[in-house]
A protein has these predicted regions:
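Glycine-rich phosphate-binding loop of ATP-dependent small-molecule kinases
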Residues: 1-194
């Protein structure tokens, strides 16, 4: 049975960092929607031209566009044995579309992690990332907008996955290795249960 993992959490919670480690440690495809969109912008593709102003303003990319992007990516050969989703879903319609996509192929999510960090810690991490990486979407205005959108649009997904019974809350305001050790333990338990 494939191992399919989803990471939720406010921007700056450490989703990208932990997703890379999970993918590497368990041999899973790392599906990072933010990275996919930034690559499309860098390539100058039609998709990139459409999403660049959206990302730079801190807004969410429209559901239909994100759902199609994920649908295509989940059909890739490297995702057959499992994947880590980082940055999708961000809205209830996206979550429902993902549930439907996975049900169609008989692959329910193995485990959903909510990386929990206080907003002030997330903001501090994002400002540091902006200084170190110079990402155009990490301006103070965009960060504030993304936090607001997370609490309004994405945070309700925590309740959705809690009802489905596969949500694991992880306190992300700790050293990276401690967070990952707890994630590893939960993934091992999810594998045994499936």
């Amino acid at each position: 049975m494939p191992l399919d993992v989803l990471l939720l959490g406010v921007q700056g919670a450490g989703k990208g960092t932990q997703a890379k480690r999970i993918a590497s440690d368990f041999g899973l495809a790392h599906i990072a929607t933010g990275e996919m969109l930034r690559d499309a912008i860098a390539d100058g593709s039609e998709l990139g031209r459409r999403v660049q102003p959206i990302l730079e303003s801190g807004e969410l990319v429209p559901d239909d566009l994100m759902i199609e992007l994920i649908r295509e990516r989940l059909q890739s050969e490297d995702a057959e044995n499992g994947f880590v989703l980082d940055g999708f879903p961000r809205t209830m319609p996206q979550a429902e579309a993902l549930d439907s996509m996975l049900a169609d192929i008989g692959r329910p999510l193995s485990v959903v992690f909510e990386l929990q960090v206080p907003d002030d810690v997330a903001v501090e991490r994002l400002h540091l990332r902006a200084e170190q990486e110079g990402r155009a979407d990490d301006t103070p205005e965009a960060i504030e907008k993304r936090l607001e959108l997370y609490h309004r649009e994405t945070e309700p997904l925590v309740g959705h996955y809690r009802l489905l019974g596969n949500l694991v809350g992880i306190h992300g305001n700790r050293p990276e290795n401690e967070v990952f050790a707890e994630i590893q333990q939960a993934v091992d338990q999810a594998r045994v249960a499936s």
